[in-house]
Amino acid sequence: MKPLYRFCYALSGFLAKTVFSYRAFGQENIIEEGPAIMAANHQSYLDPPLIGITCRNELYYLARKTLFEKKLLGSLISRVNAFPVDLSRGDVTAVRAIINLLKKGHRTVIFPEGTRSLDGKIQRARPGIGMIIAKTLVPVVPIRIFGSFEAWPKGGKIRPHPVTVVVGKPMRFVKEDFGGNNRESYQKISERVLAAIAAIRRPD
C-alpha cells in the first residue's frame, strides 16, 4: 500500500470499529490480486471506506468530478485511488474510466445501483456494470453492507450505528452469458449481480 492509503486504511478501520462496531464476514471470498470488481449495495458515504477496510490490498474508486474541485479534498482522495467522473455526462464516462482501471490490473469498487439509496433498500440496477463485465470478463465479488444507511443516510447526519459487511462468493462470466452487445443484455447481467448482492444475508 502507498503510505497515505495505508494511513487512511488504518484510520478508517479504527473509526469503523470504535464508532460503528464494524464487523466483516466472508473475507476469504475476496479476490486480492489481479483485476476484479467489488460490487456492493450503496446506502451511504461510508460504503467506500467500509469496502476498503474489508479488503487487505488497495482498491480503486470513482468519485464525482466536483469533489476534485476542492483543492485539499481533491488532493487527498486522488492519493487514495479515487478518479474523477463527470456525472453530467452519464454512465458512459464512468464505464470507460472503470474499464481502463481494470485493464491496468486494478480492483475497482462499483455500485450497480449507481447512487445512494434514499430509504436504505436496494434499488434497481443500472446497465453500466453489465457493460463493464461484457467488455472485460473480470470476476465480480458481490458485497452487501448492512447498517450504513442508519449510520449516515443520504441527506442526514452521521451517528453511531453498527455496520456489517458480508462478502459473497465470486461470480465469473463468459461471452456466452451475453445475448449481444446491447443495453438489454447489459441490464440482465447487472440484475444478476444485484440479485447476488441482495441474496447475501447478515450472520446472526
Regions found by a protein language model. Name each.
Residues 1-23:
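N-terminal membrane-anchoring alpha-helices
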Residues 21, 35, 162-164:
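A residue-level signal for beta-strand positions that form part of recognition/binding surfaces
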Residues 10, 17-18, 30-89, 97:
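Catalytic core of membrane glycerolipid acyltransferases/transacylases, capturing the structured
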Residues 28-31, 157-158:
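A short beta-turn/loop motif at secondary-structure boundaries
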Residues 3-4, 93-204:
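Non-catalytic C-terminal accessory region of glycerolipid acyltransferases
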Residues 23-24, 29, 168-171:
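A short N-terminal beta-strand-loop micro-motif at the entrance of redox/enzyme domains
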Residues 17-25, 89, 146-149:
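Short gly/ser/thr-rich secondary-structure transition/capping motifs
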Residues 22-24, 82, 140, 165:
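Generic structural signal for residues in well-ordered beta-strands
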